[in-house]
């Protein structure tokens, strides 16, 4: 049966690091102080039962998944679905991944409506892409079509996006004047389907 080799508490961050194993093999697990208290505060040398070990492993995995999610979101914006799938690909369980995504949403690190607005505005005003291209592109990143439509409509209503003006800028940038070429460009950049 595994034994507790060390316990390190951090009352500010409200978590505890427990070293469990034998003299040759030590693994560190991070749990909340509440979980540590629920285990009846095991001290150095005490044995850990199967049930307690399962609880410690589950909570440690959730803690690591949350930290990894913060790292992924620091790189760039992701949808809830994309973040969850990335965590699962990294080897975390579905439950730990879902918990990490929920925690990111609760703390405001993952705000899909705001992310969508920024992404739609960037695609429309800077990359000069049309409504249908934007929908296809962002749906491929894991955002729902209804949320994408809502973000596009909101930005158009606020006057932040004018697809007709953007198309004229695109034609001017490309030096296109004939109607045939303009029609071709409309389809290619998603102004028409």
Model-identified regions with their sequence ranges:
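An alpha-helical, amphipathic repeat domain used for nucleic-acid recognition
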Residues: 1-193
């Amino acid at each position: 049966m595994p034994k507790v080799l060390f316990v390190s508490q951090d009352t500010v961050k409200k978590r505890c690091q427990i070293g469990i194993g034998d003299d040759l093999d030590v693994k560190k697990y991070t749990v909340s102080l509440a979980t540590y208290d629920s285990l009846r505060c095991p001290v150095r040398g005490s044995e850990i039962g199967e049930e307690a070990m399962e609880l410690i492993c589950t909570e440690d995995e959730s803690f690591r998944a949350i930290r990894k999610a913060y790292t992924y979101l620091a790189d760039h914006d992701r949808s809830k679905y994309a973040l969850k799938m990335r965590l699962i690909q990294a080897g975390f369980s579905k439950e730990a991944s879902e918990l990490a995504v929920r925690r990111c949403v609760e703390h405001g690190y993952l705000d899909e409506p705001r992310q969508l607005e920024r992404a739609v505005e960037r695609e429309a005003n800077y990359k000069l892409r049309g409504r249908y291209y934007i929908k296809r592109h962002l749906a491929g990143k894991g955002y729902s079509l209804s949320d994408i439509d809502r973000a596009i409509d909101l930005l158009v209503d606020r006057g932040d996006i004018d697809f007709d003006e953007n198309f004229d800028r695109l034609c001017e940038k490309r030096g296109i004047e004939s109607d045939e070429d303009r029609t071709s460009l409309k389809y290619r950049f998603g102004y028409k389907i």
